[in-house]
Amino acid sequence: MSEEKPLNVPEYLLIRSAEARAKHLGISVEQALAEIKGESQPVEEPVAEVEEVVEEPVEEPVAEVEEVVEEPVVEEPVEEPVVEAEETNQEVSIENKTVESIPAVTIRFAGDSGDGMQLVGTRFTDTSALFGNDLATLPAFPAEIRAPQGTVAGVSSFQVQIADFDILTPGDAPDVLVAMNPAALKAHLQDLTPNGMLILNEDAFDEKNIKKAGYEIDPRESEELDGYRVFQVPMEKLTKEALQEFDLPGRAVLRSKNMIALGLISWTFNRDLKDTENWINDKFKNLPEVAKANIKALKTGYNFGITVEAFHHTYKVDKASLPAGEYTNINGNIGLSWGLIAGAKKANLDLFYGSYPITPASDILHELSKHKNFNVLTFQAEDEIAAAAAAVGASFTGKLAVTGTSGPGLALKSETISLALSAELPLVVVNVQRGGPSTGLPTKPEQSDLMFAMYGRHGEAPLPVIAAKSPSHAFYAAFEATRIALKYMTPVILLSDNYVATGSEPWKLPEIENLDELGTNLTTTYNTENGFLPFFRDYETNARPWAIPGVPGLEHRVGGLEKEDGTGNVSYDTDNHQYMTDMRAWKIENIANDIDPLEINGDISSDTLILGWGSTFGGITQAVNRLNSKGVKVASAHFTHVNPFPDNTAEVLSQFKNIIVPELNTGQLSKLLRARYLVDTVGINKVEGLPFTAQELEEKIESLINSFGTKLEPIVEEVVAEEEPVVEEVVEEEEPQEEVGIPEHLIMRSAEARAKALGIPVEQVLEEMSADKPAAETQEPVVEEEPIVEEEPVVEEVKSDTSEEPAAEAQEPVVERVVERVTERVTERIIEKVDETLPENKELVKDVEEERNKVEEEKKEEVKTDE
């Protein structure tokens, strides 16, 4: 058994915790910091205070455990070599228990997709939220309904960070890893912090599972686990023995092993079981035997922690200092659903939600279907197009119409969204982004639909785009999307993503009466002296009136054909089409005056701005805070409205010399900013199916800041000092780069795949792919002659004449050489694979070589002519 050591806590967390503690206790930060670092030592007063506070709630579940677990369920497995339990009992364990206060901890549960890891993580999260911790979560699971058991591809995980201060991310890396099988260990061990706590379900580490996970030997017997505190727990054995009194099938019994893990973690971090017990009883109220079995397994895991001496050193994360109010733990999909309901109520409209099930947006449909009492009508259509069309129809009849989907569905809905835009009807389109293209990564986050949301419709079809930045902000983003759609009579795209949608955090419930009343353009009367004009616009918002069918005298046409301004009659007039196109665009641009300005956070005197949008908010904000605390000058700003941008965006951008844009795509916001504001940006881009961690951004931002202002200076000095040699150097060095133009990591990945397919060494493939080395001896004349003979005249020509034509000519040999080399390499591979013993193939090889020699001779003649 590994030596008991405190969890590794980053210094910045200790400082944040000390500052909060000093503020509430009226003591100095230094004193609070000393208390935190010394609380695990029983000789110091703060420890006594912590133990008195902690033991009261702990004893209550302990007493219940003794009453329920009368049989020696835990005592027998405890006598295994894994723990030294024969010398302990519950009373001695409680007396010897130590409680270490820590400001934060990150825990990751990992196992097969059928092991209930999402449930365990959610229950621990909810219990911590009720206790009063601030928290953030990161669920991760395979796209398959039932992924291959015991394989790394089938691993499901749930990460949660709990803290006694305000946090914005689920943690950089887990301090505690609960691995239910070898595959879970294989998938997540590399993320565990040094000296982290590793809890293994030892019953799953048999030869079959070890090989299935890709291990050659049992990882517990290797050096791989050195540097971690390893705790082996016989979870399956404990489950079987605890539930033997229940009349349940064997497989059903083993499904409860996740409750063993939850009970043990609850003991280790001083969480009460009562809330989870209540949840189990409610969940299985129609299956009381199953409910009792799960509660028994839960208490068995808790009791194991009490009994086993290795778990006597426990941890406590105090309540966070959150603003007063009523809180609930909420994920992004639920928050978004509630925001739509609130918007409908504040507009005094019924809510219609038309959708087709798609990951990860389906939970919105499920949640809204529970709220018929708020006049919510949900419609599950046969496909994405039908769902969108039904929503447009509902909007025409005066409902707050919403349709929801993810990337592939947004593509299918695009024509119907154009219809709503042309008809100028209010519609909220929810797009929960995921990895693409096509089916892509259905359960992984990505921000790759921004450009599609902006421009993914035929014709000139601008519309507002709003992005949720966190699970709790999803409520307000949905409410804002509703406000804009109704006020400006337009479709609005609301962007979320899998990280926001499935992640959770505590959310302070708003006072409904404090939410703005939402007006509408609904009308039941004529809007001019001459009657009703369906496209007679409001002079402030440019929105047309909203008249629903059945109102006498307000009959009018809607549809996809262009309408005449004012009357709404079908019109093919060219001037009218220009006018209507401009008016629709101006209506959207005008919204910039009706949204909050872009705010700057951090060090506003900095030269560097970190600019993000959507779900990158938490990682960016936390990274900037850390950098500021280290003395690094940097500021941040974040878009929640990405079309139109806030009206002060240009002013904000002009205040900074360097703009860094982190995105979970390949630079889509950067492209928009460059096109709109003519500013240069530096992207931090990632499409790995994972969100940014604060540590990852902190390191990359600091590296970029250190490089700003210096990377161009040596080049400038070189050009001024020696103009002629510098030009020659640039030509000689840059042209080979243009020939390759491929990032190093892509070259390596390509070489590895090619080597594997051809059965040759990676080194040989790299040599063939290298731009500086020939793939075959016959290529030597081409490679050697081109740079020497052709480059020098080009350089001199560029130097002697500043016109554009010679510069263009200078580029042509580079392109030609790239094409030639690719052709030659393909030819070489064809010849290598051809069986030369066959007569027809001999002729083929001969023809190819003759053609190549002919080309080389022509080239030599061209060179002589040029000279």
Where does each model-flagged region fall?
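Intrinsically disordered, low-complexity regulatory segments in eukaryotic proteins
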Residues: 1-33, 39, 726-767
